[in-house]
Amino acid sequence: MSENRTRFRLDQRRAPIYEALEQFRQMRVVPFDVPGHKRGRGNPELTAFLGQQCVGVDVNSMKPLDNLCHPVSVIREAEELAADAFGAAHAFLMVGGTTSSVQSMVLTVCKRGDEIILPRNVHRSVLNALVLCGAVPVYVNPEVDKRLGISLGMKREQVEKAIKEHPNAVAVLVNNPTYYGICSDLRAIVKMAHDAGMLCLADEAHGTH
């Protein structure tokens, strides 16, 4: 990250959110707000199921723990550490799983009538985002491995053809990898998209498996 964007001295041995939660737990605050299990006191069945260590730090957003809507302390530091670890300019912690992240990504880029190039086997969150923003999908049909019976990634030739036929598309979206672990040539696709003045979006929800 650039120096003007980084507020904290980055130390990858730190775990800012965990550390803040642990400090808050040790304060033994008596809760009068949400969640209703009151750090386990109000729901012994839930505590027995999840464990005291878990419910003891399941607390409401408050100043010592920062606020995800406008992070300025521990969440902001965690985001900067994540960006540094990933080699990215910025990182944003999300709630709602990768579905909300993918939808946010598409809605940030596309508006009504915009074309976006994407594989036919995208996650439904992408399709939901297109419905919400009114963008027009330009589908690339991935080939199928007949022996394994699974769909593959987008080929460079397929993406190149789609870009030439739809030069006004605003972005190319790639599953990296697919739900079966198949990766497209992401580096080549990114270059093709950028050379055409398009953004390249990557759904990497299954990339950690």
Where are these regions (language model features)?
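Conserved N-terminal alpha-helix of the aminotransferase class I/II PLP-enzyme fold
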Residues: 52-100
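N-terminal "arm"/small-domain region of PLP-dependent enzymes with the aminotransferase-like
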Residues: 1-73
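Active-site phosphate-binding strand-loop segment of PLP-dependent enzymes
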Residues: 148-209
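PLP-dependent aminotransferase-like
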Residues: 114-174
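Short glycine/serine/threonine/alanine-rich loop segments
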Residues: 88, 135, 198
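Conserved beta-loop-alpha segment that forms the PLP phosphate-binding cup at the N-terminus of a helix
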Residues: 90-116, 129
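Gly/Ser/Thr-rich loops at beta-strand to alpha-helix junctions
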Residues: 75, 96-101, 122-124, 178-182, ...
